[in-house]
Amino acid sequence: MVRTRYEYSLRSKKIRIFDTTLRDGEQAPGIDLTTEQKIMIARKLADLGVDVIEAGFPASSEGEFIATRKIFEEIGDQVEVIGLSRSNKNDIDKTISTGISSIHLFIATSELHMKYKLKMTKEEVLNKIYESVKYAKDHGMIVEFSPEDATRTEEDFLFTAIRTAIEAGADRINIPDTVGTMHPFKYYDMIKKIVNFVGERIIVSVHCHNDFGLATANSLAGVYAGARQAHVTVNGIGERAGNASLEEVVMGIKKLLNYETNVKTWKLYEVSRFVAEMTGVPVPYFKAIVGDNAFGHESGIHVHGVIENPFTYEPISPEEVGNFRRLALGKHSGIHGLRKLLEEQGIYLSDDKLKIVLAEIKKLAESGNKVTVEDAKNIALKLMNS
């Protein structure tokens, strides 16, 4: 059953996750998904438990139109499927004709965008907002409205634009930090004002870009300020420096804010790798939550701590996100980690012999070689047979 906005009251600590991997994520240069690939990713996202899937921008191409329609036909009974649309009737009609019942309308509200891109006055933009939202509502759509470049919009005009959208019937207001120029303190204050302005009936959403590496931090600040929905992409893919990362935002909401989502967190690693395979964009080695080194340890002090109690050097367990703990060998290794790795191979040595093996491992590593468990095993066996 698709969850509606009415299930998420202002007092609720359950936050909606709006995934835009298939729209904003795919806008990254070099990512061009086929309709079948988009459907496969959408199935994974629905199974993961996101609340909203932005399937595409139906008016932008025939392929986007078909993909949006097919995704809705496949999973529209499991999750809210939404399509992006400019604030004009042609785009709205195209989006409606896909069969979906939710639309994400946007128009820029910053002076910069209005002057150089839209070449429209404030009055013209406000008229577009009212007419497009009302038109979509008159056609029975759930409407989420985004004042594009909201964080660089003059405050009084931003609030006028938001009020105009709500008066026309908008159900949700999304606040995009379009080029990632916010920091958490400012974004918190901004979202707090907007939440208080719109009241409990309207869901406020956050949409953060990563141009200064703050997309996750800003998203969490916005949620902490009262936003009840966060826009994310798997692995943080997207234009320029990318978007707020689904896995980081979800785990931040859960572990740092102590709020809930409907996401099955133990599937995060699996979905991350699936999207990486489909898009051809690898997951960074040091990526938080789902990177291969997110739960990797080499330092002897750290490994000893993790062996005794993993939470000494891990804020969450790898199993909680479907990832794996990796104990590595190198010049920083200690005897406790070496003992554990060898015992997992069925090799048991005295402390004196472990020290000899450890010295050989460090010598190997300091020569610029990557030391594997197999190397340690061979050194140990050679010592045992000597």
From Swiss-Prot:
Residues 15-269 form the Pyruvate carboxyltransferase domain. It is an enzyme of class 2 (transferase). A divalent metal cation binds at residues 24, 207, 209, 243. Its cofactor is a divalent metal cation. GO terms for biological process: L-leucine biosynthetic process. InterPro entries: 2-IPM_HCS-like, AIPM/Hcit_synth_CS, Aldolase_TIM, IPMS, LEU1_arch, LeuA/HCS_post-cat, PYR_CT. It catalyses: 3-methyl-2-oxobutanoate + acetyl-CoA + H2O = (2S)-2-isopropylmalate + CoA + H(+). Pathway: Amino-acid biosynthesis; L-leucine biosynthesis; L-leucine from 3-methyl-2-oxobutanoate: step 1/4. CDD domains: DRE_TIM_IPMS. Its EC number is 2.3.3.13. Keywords: Amino-acid biosynthesis, Branched-chain amino acid biosynthesis, Leucine biosynthesis, Metal-binding, Transferase. Belongs to the alpha-IPM synthase/homocitrate synthase family. Homodimer. Catalyzes the condensation of the acetyl group of acetyl-CoA with 3-methyl-2-oxobutanoate (2-oxoisovalerate) to form 3-carboxy-3-hydroxy-4-methylpentanoate (2-isopropylmalate). Carries out the first step of the leucine biosynthesis pathway. This is 2-isopropylmalate synthase.
